Each structure stands twice: as structure tokens, then as C-alpha cells.
């Protein structure tokens, strides 16, 4: 017999520990015996548990293989390796006994898998599972039956809960309205327990009388436990829209806000979380909370020290303040900004920091809250988290800083913030770079200390690299150019910054921004930057080689033509009205002329400017009603008049009459430039003519004390310049920003706006490009030198000999204006 033959050699227990161990694995792969053994191990030699016939038996593992006929040699080899793999032999009787045991316990195994609760305690059922990671067929088939059983049990329990609650609610409602406080307390506790189960919770929220009774009990009871149970029930109901509606209709919001003064932590938690759910999901809740004084109560709660509680409270404040100016003012009056800044400095719980930064972001667009946040140290507090791993927190901090940055007046130390902002310029996140550029631009505006810090921290190099990477993204290039414009003028390190731009190959990139597709706000900022770079004589040649002069003249002519055309169409008023993309064309005229004035200090540039046939336009600008344009036009003519040919061309264009008129200007800069040009034009004139000019210049430049002198030499800062509408000019274009942050978003609903699209933000206010004139340099190095300071000349005389004035330093009449 086949069974006997295998048994005499080596019988094998299919449940033996180590089945399929090293002995089987050592068989050669090509050996047919190994294939047979693996087949028996994985599928055939295992009891499936579903042979239900009384006469069936598990197949013996010693059955003859079909590979047995492969020859005595192969069979002998298989038997040898089989013996080597196992150290213990089983007799046929033992194998039969184990097979019989498996057959007898088959039904018990099925019952244990599908209905384990029906087995008697202590009964041991042999398992046929070899690998815990691979369930048997019975175990797999039992899963659906177990799920069905649990579903039936849940349905039975749910129905029981629902029936119980439905029968109990009327009685519990009556008890909640009882005059006996003990009865009310017990009823509140029972309702609270019922609200923890879903079925009974639905029954409670479907009873308006029950919810109203809970609200009354919560409001009128002085018992802490009753209040806690009632508030806990409302908290459970607030997780469902139907529950929120019933709480709202029953007047639950005023009652919940009253609980915000409770000294009990659990009551506070129930109240604030329920209010939070109402604010998020129930229409009308925001107004109800405001009317009930919820904002004041919530701000008072900011002094608590539970981070998770504070996170919910600050999120409520954000929901209430967003888009509602009245709420922002209430938060301000309640001391909210200082409390929020304290949270940003004190805690490290990410969710709390995120929700708090969201409130600050909403408040940062309010002109009343901005100074309060800054004075409380909000700038440095927000800067602490710019290196946080949470991207959403970093982004909120940057947005808030951008909105606040125009309000900073050096009240706190922001050097670490500036250092972090310079580092963020290297970020791969466009939003981060956009915000960082805008913040740097605002913080360096009219702030010499911040300019120095940024320059010393390699900020100029970082800004140039940012321009190179930004390409045509004007939401980045415009604030970056503005920041560069600020750090290259009016501080001790300005000249170093001007050189740094050139040494980092920034001039080609900057000049390129004067060309399309750049729009007017970016062009305006770039013109101002080029004007500052031209203050460094080493930059004159690179700017000329990159075609800066040609492009500046083109922009000047285009802007002037646009101004003339719009004026002829009926635009009146000398201070504005000609806007394009929110930029006054008069500002472009002034900026380009001012840049050409500084570039004209170089003799090669003067020759190039003369060859571009723009002297007639400069002369025409002398008639302009805007004083700043008169000043820069006279300034560039004073440089061009250094060359004899230039002076002759200026005279041929009829400049004598307007220049003579400008000698009487109340602006000292205009009068001084006009005098210089007239003097140089008179060089080759007869002596009598020169004498008359000298007398005229003397009477104009040396006015007596009884005659009112002109305006102060210094231009007002950017914070003193009034908007066009306040000066009687044309009302500003809707896209033109009003005074305030030139790089912040000012809108009643601007709290969550993404970084603005190109040219929608970062406009440069209403002032002239920074700085139009840093000094009244009347030129030098030519044959017609003149000291504008005119030192110790004494009183006016009838005959003033200007030839006797020696050449001197031309910085005596330093003329500073705004960083805008």
C-alpha cells in the first residue's frame, strides 16, 4: 500500500512545528519532489474545515505522488533529504489519530469562528492556522457574519435608545422646568447621559421644548453641576445641524456667552466649543454673538493658559472679525492686539499659533488696529515664527507682516526679522518670496537704520538674485525693485549698495525691466532705482551700454505725450488726473527726467542725450505747472549747459524766457538751476548782456529779509505727502493706492487675499519717485563751474560778478526727498 510505503520511510505530521522548514528549502529547485511537498504544504495537506461528509477523511500527507514513477534514484534522493529535514518520526497510527481529531472538531472550529459567544468556557479548539498573518478560509468567511451580527445588535440597541428617549423626553422636560432645584439637577444629569447616545440625541434635538428647557435651566440655575450637564448636552447637540438650529432658535447664544464668565473649566469648554460650532455652521450666529457681547468676553478669555482652549477662542475671534469693521474695533477696545501678540510670543502649540496669526492678519488691514499691534511688538513676535515647520503658519505671519510693515516706526528691535526676510528671498515658494520682498520694501522706506541692516546682511545681493529668478512675475519684481531703490540711497551704506548691484550683474536685469511687458508701476520703481544707481559714477558706463538712456528718453516722451493728450481732452488740475495702471504720467515724466539729470553728469552721457533731440522737450517742461517737474527739467538743462554746444542748443530752443521767469520761483532748487543755466548761456555774450544777467541773478538769489523766501529745501517724507484728492486735484483712479502701506492690501475684505496679481499692489503712493533729487549738483568739471552755495556774498549789489566765485563742492544744497 502507498500509505504503508511512505510510513515506513518517514511519516509526517501536517501540524508539526517547522513544517516547510530548512529541509524543504534545501531541495533543489528542479527536483520534482520539492514541488510536490510545496503543493501539499500550501493547499492539499491542510484541512479546509468544510468537508462535511461523515465518510470523508482528510487526505493523508503520505499519499503517493505522481512523481513517484520517476525512478528509484530520484526517489532515494527525495527520501534522504526528507529525513535530513526532520528529526522526529511519526507512526501511521499517530497520523491517523491527528486526522481523526481534526475531523471531529470541524464543526467546533466553524462555531468558534462565526459564533464565539456560543462556546463553553475552557474548551480548547485546535487551530489549523499555520501563519497568523494569513487567516484560514473559515476565518475569512466568518467576517461578513460577524459584521451582520454587530449591525443587528446596533439596530436593536439604537431602537431601544430611541424608544427610551421618546418616552422619557416629555417627562424630563417637565422635570427641567420644576421649581425644585434638586429635581432640575437630576433631570439635567439624565438628559446629559441620554445625549451621549446617538439615537436619544436625535430624539432630544427633535424636541424644541426640551432644548428650550435646557437653555432655561442653564441660564437660571446657580448649581454648577446643573449648569455643567445642561451645557454638556447642548455641546453634544451642536455636532448636528438640527441641534445647532434648535439651540439658535431657543436663545441659546446669549446663555452660552453668559457661561464664558464661569470659573468651571468644563463649563467654559462646553460653552466655547458650542459657540464655535454655531459660528461655523449656523447662519445668523455671528450677529447674535456680537449683540450679546461675545467679543468682549472672548477677548477676556485670552489671558487663560490652556493652549487648546485658546485655539478655539482665537478661531471664534477670527470668524467674528473677518470682514466686519465693528468687530475689529471692539477687539481693539478690549485690548485684543496686545493679548494676541502675547500668545504669539508665549506658546509653541502650532494650531494656536496658526489661529492667532489668522486673527492678527484680519486685524492688520484695519488702520486702527495696525498701530496697536506694532506698538505691542507684533512685528518681532510674528518674525519669531518665520522659520517654523508649518507652512500655513509661516504664510499667515508673512501676510500679516506685509500689512503691518508700513506702520513700523522702529518701536521694537526687528533686526532678526530683517535677517530672516533676507533669507526667505531664497525660498522656492513664490508666495513667500512675494511677501518677503514687500515687507523689506516697506521696512526700508525712510528708515536709514533698516537700510543699513539689510545692506550689511547681504540684502542687496539677495534682492538682485531675486530679480534674476523672478523673470516677468511683477508681483515679485516690483517690491524687489522698490526695496533696492530704498537701500541704494539716503543712508551711509548707499554707495556700497549702488556698487553691489553692478558687481552682482544686476544692471542688465534692471534696465530690462524698463521694457515690455513691464507695466507702469514697475517702470516707475525701476526709473527711481536707475536714478539712484546713477549717483555712483562707476555705473554710468554700464547703464549707457545697456541702453538705459535711450529707453528713459522714450519713456519720457511717451509719458509727456500721454499727459498732453489727456490734458487736451479736458483733464484739469496741476496735481493729477493722468493715470495709467494707477500711476500718474506726471510722475513718470518727473522720474525719467530726474534720472537723465544724474546720468548727464557723465560727459559721454551728455553727448548721447544731446544726440537724442530731447532738449526741446526739457525746455517745454519748464512751463509745466508742477514744481517738481520744473526742478528736474532745469536740473538736466544745467548739466547739459556745461558743454558749450549744449548751452547753445538750449538757447536756440527759446529757454531764456522760461528760465528767467523761474529765477523768481519760491522753490530754491528751481531758481538755482535756472540761474546756472542762464549764466552758462551768457558766457559768450557781450559784457553788457552779462552785466544785466548778473544783476538779475543777484536780485533773484539774494532776496532781502522782508521778502518771503521759498519753501524749505527738504522735501516732505512719504508720510507727509497728501493724496491728490486732498490737494484739490483729480480724484484718484480706483486702482491707485491711498496713503498707507504701499505694499499691503487695504480692503474691508482683503484679509485672505492671495499675493496680488501683477501691478495690483506695491504702488508707490502719491509722492515723487525716491529720491528725485538727492542734491542740487549744478555740474562740475566744465568751463562754466558755479558754486550754488554762493558763500559769504554779502547783500545784493547792482553789479554782481559771478566770475569771481571759485568752483567748490556742489553738495552745499543737499536736497533730500521721499523714499517713495
Curated annotation (Swiss-Prot):
Keywords: Cell adhesion, Cytoplasm, Cytoskeleton, Repeat. Residues 1-16 have a biased composition (Polar residues). One of its GO terms (cellular component) is cytoskeleton. The keyword Cytoplasm applies. The keyword Repeat applies. It is found in: Cytoplasm; Cytoplasm, Cytoskeleton. It comes from the Eukaryota. InterPro entries: ARM-like (IPR011989), ARM-type_fold (IPR016024), Armadillo (IPR000225), Beta-catenin (IPR013284). ARM repeats lie at residues 157-196, 199-239, 241-280, 283-322, 367-405, 406-445, 448-489, 495-535, 603-642, 644-683. Its main location: cytoplasm. One of its GO terms (molecular function) is cadherin binding. Signal peptide: none annotated. Residues 52-63, 785-796 have a biased composition (Low complexity). Binds to the cytoplasmic domain of the cell-cell adhesion molecule E-cadherin, and perhaps to other (membrane) proteins. The association of catenins to cadherins produces a complex which is linked to the actin filament network, and which seems to be of primary importance for cadherins cell-adhesion properties. Belongs to the beta-catenin family. PANTHER family: ARMADILLO SEGMENT POLARITY PROTEIN. This is Catenin beta. It comes from Tripneustes gratilla (Hawaian sea urchin).
Amino acid at each position: 500500500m502507498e500509505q504503508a510505503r511512505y510510513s515506513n520511510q518517514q511519516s509526517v505530521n501536517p501540524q508539526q512545528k517547522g513544517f516547510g522548514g530548512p529541509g524543504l528549502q534545501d531541495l533543489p529547485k528542479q527536483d520534482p519532489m520539492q514541488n510536490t511537498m510545496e503543493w501539499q504544504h500550501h493547499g492539499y495537506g491542510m484541512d479546509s474545515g468544510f468537508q462535511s461528509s461523515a465518510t470523508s477523511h482528510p487526505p493523508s500527507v503520505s499519499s503517493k505522488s505522481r512523481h513517484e514513477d520517476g525512478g528509484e534514484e530520484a526517489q532515494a534522493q527525495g527520501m534522504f533529504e526528507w529525513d535530513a529535514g526532520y528529526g522526529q518520526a511519526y507512526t501511521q497510527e499517530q497520523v491517523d489519530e491527528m486526522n481523526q481529531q481534526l475531523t471531529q472538531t470541524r464543526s467546533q472550529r466553524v462555531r468558534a469562528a462565526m459564533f464565539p459567544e456560543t462556546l463553553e468556557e475552557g474548551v480548547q479548539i485546535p487551530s489549523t492556522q499555520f501563519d497568523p498573518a494569513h487567516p484560514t478560509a473559515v476565518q475569512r468567511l466568518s467576517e461578513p457574519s460577524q459584521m451582520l451580527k454587530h449591525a443587528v445588535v446596533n439596530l436593536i440597541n439604537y431602537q431601544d435608545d430611541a424608544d427610551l428617549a421618546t418616552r422619557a423626553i416629555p417627562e424630563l422636560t417637565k422635570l427641567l422646568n420644576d421649581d425644585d432645584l434638586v429635581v432640575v439637577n437630576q433631570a439635567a444629569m439624565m438628559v446629559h447621559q441620554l445625549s451621549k447616545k446617538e439615537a436619544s440625541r436625535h430624539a432630544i434635538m427633535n424636541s424644541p421644548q426640551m432644548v428650550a428647557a435646557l437653555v432655561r435651566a442653564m441660564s437660571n440655575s446657580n448649581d454648577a453641576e446643573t449648569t455643567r450637564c445642561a451645557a454638556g448636552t447642548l455641546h453634544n447637540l451642536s455636532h448636528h445641524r438640527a441641534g445647532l438650529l434648535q439651540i439658535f432658535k431657543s436663545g441659546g447664544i446669549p446663555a452660552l456667552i453668559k457661561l464664558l464668565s464661569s470659573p468651571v473649566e468644563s463649563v467654559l469648554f462646553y460653552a466655547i466649543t458650542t459657540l464655535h460650532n454655531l459660528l461655523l455652521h449656523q447662519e445668523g450666529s455671528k450677529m447674535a454673538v456680537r449683540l450679546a457681547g461675545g467679543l468682549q468676553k472672548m477677548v477676556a478669555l485670552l489671558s487663560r493658559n490652556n493652549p487648546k482652549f485658546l485655539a478655539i477662542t482665537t478661531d471664534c475671534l477670527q470668524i467674528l472679525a473677518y470682514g466686519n469693521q465693528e468687530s475689529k474695533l471692539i477687539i481693539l477696545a478690549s485690548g485684543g492686539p496686545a493679548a494676541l501678540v502675547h500668545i504669539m510670543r508665549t506658546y509653541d502649540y502650532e494650531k494656536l499659533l496658526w489661529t492667532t496669526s489668522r486673527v492678527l492678519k484680519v486685524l492688520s488691514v484695519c488702520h486702527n488696529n495696525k498701530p496697536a499691534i506694532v506698538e505691542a511688538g507684533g512685528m518681532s513676535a510674528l518674525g519669531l515664527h518665520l522659520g517654523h515647520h508649518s507652512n500655513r503658519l509661516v504664510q499667515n505671519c508673512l501676510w500679516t507682516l506685509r500689512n503691518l510693515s508700513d506702520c513700523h516706526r522702529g518701536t521694537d528691535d526687528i533686526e532678526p526679522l530683517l535677517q530672516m526676510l533676507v533669507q526667505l528671498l531664497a525660498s522656492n515658494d513664490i508666495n513667500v518670496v512675494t511677501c518677503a520682498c514687500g515687507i523689506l520694501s516697506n521696512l526700508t522706506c525712510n528708515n536709514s537704520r533698516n537700510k543699513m541692516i539689510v545692506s550689511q546682511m547681504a540684502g542687496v545681493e539677495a534682492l538682485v538674485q531675486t530679480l534674476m529668478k523672478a523673470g516677468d512675475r511683477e508681483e515679485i519684481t516690483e517690491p524687489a525693485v522698490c526695496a533696492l531703490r530704498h537701500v541704494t540711497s539716503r543712508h551711509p551704506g548707499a554707495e556700497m549698495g549702488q556698487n553691489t548691484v553692478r558687481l552682482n550683474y544686476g544692471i542688465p536685469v534692471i534696465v530690462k525691466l524698463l521694457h515690455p511687458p513691464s507695466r507702469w508701476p514697475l517702470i516707475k520703481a525701476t526709473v527711481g532705482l536707475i536714478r539712484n544707481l546713477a549717483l555712483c559714477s562707476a555705473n554710468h558706463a554700464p547703464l549707457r551700454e545697456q541702453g538705459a538712456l535711450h529707453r528713459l528718453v522714450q519713456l519720457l516722451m511717451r509719458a509727456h505725450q500721454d499727459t498732453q493728450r489727456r490734458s487736451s481732452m479736458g483733464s484739469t488740475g496741476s496735481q493729477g488726473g493722468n493715470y495709467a495702471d494707477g500711476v500718474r504720467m506726471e510722475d513718470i515724466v518727473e522720474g525719467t527726467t530726474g534720472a537723465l539729470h544724474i546720468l548727464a553728469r557723465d560727459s559721454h552721457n551728455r553727448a548721447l542725450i544731446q544726440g537724442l533731440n530731447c532738449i526741446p522737450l526739457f525746455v517745454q517742461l519748464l512751463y509745466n505747472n508742477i514744481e517738481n517737474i520744473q526742478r528736474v527739467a532745469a536740473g538736466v538743462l544745467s548739466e547739459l549747459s556745461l558743454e558749450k554746444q549744449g548751452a547753445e542748443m538750449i538757447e536756440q530752443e527759446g529757454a531764456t524766457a522760461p528760465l528767467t521767469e523761474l529765477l523768481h520761483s519760491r522753490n530754491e532748487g528751481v531758481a538755482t538751476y535756472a540761474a546756472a543755466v542762464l549764466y552758462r548761456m551768457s558766457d559768450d555774450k557781450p559784457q553788457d548782456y552779462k552785466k544785466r544777467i548778473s544783476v538779475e541773478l543777484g536780485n533773484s538769489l539774494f532776496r532781502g529779509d522782508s521778502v518771503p523766501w521759498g519753501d524749505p529745501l527738504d522735501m516732505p517724507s512719504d508720510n507727509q505727502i497728501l493724496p491728490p484728492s486732498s490737494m484739490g486735484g483729480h480724484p484718484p483712479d480706483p486702482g491707485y493706492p491711498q496713503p498707507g502701506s504701499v505694499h499691503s492690501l487695504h480692503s474691508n475684505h482683503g484679509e485672505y487675499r492671495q499675493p496680488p496679481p501683477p501691478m495690483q499692489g506695491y504702488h508707490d503712493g502719491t509722492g515723487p519717485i525716491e529720491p528725485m533729487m538727492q542734491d542740487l549738483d549744478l555740474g562740475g568739471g566744465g568751463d562754466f563751474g558755479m558754486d550754488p552755495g554762493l558763500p559769504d556774498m554779502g547783500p545784493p549789489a547792482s553789479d554782481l560778478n559771478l566770475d569771481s566765485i571759485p568752483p567748490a563742492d556742489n553738495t552745499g544744497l543737499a536736497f533730500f526727498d521721499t523714499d517713495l
